[in-house]
Amino acid sequence: QGGMSVVLQVSLKELMISLADKNNDPNFRKALEVAEQRMVTNNSDYITLFIQAYKELNTDAKLAQLFATRNNKDVLTYESSDAAVEKYVRTQAGDAINRTYSIIQSRIDQVGTKQPIVTLEPNKGRITVEIAGVDNPARVRKLLQATANLEFWEAYRGTDIAKSINDANT
């Protein structure tokens, strides 16, 4: 029976953009690109390479200027140290990689093969999948590559906004 070996890469670049609330600072965007290029030839992790590149491009800038947003105001402020920001970003990246790993594991269980091998390289954000006895590689590839598009909407109860509606009517 045929087998299949796949290497999946978690996009830490996209995570960083999301954590920075889609910041359009040119130095931020350039540092993301530089870190991605350096990943090819360097054994360091993406976050280390990003921070190095950002500091090279903008020696006076603090990381909090990028990553302290309204979404994480309980953890980071504009006065947060670079070490605190780096710790936060690393935690978020680790969580994202582990969530992705769990999702991939559950998707492989759906394939129904015996003894799949799934290995995680957390520093590189890579997940290697080896599956024996694959009879439909296209289905497996589609299953592994599918992205989950989660959207969160702020919801209100009618009682929460009733006073505001009454005030608007008077």
Feature roles, as predicted:
Residues 1-170:
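A structural signal for conserved, well-ordered secondary-structure elements
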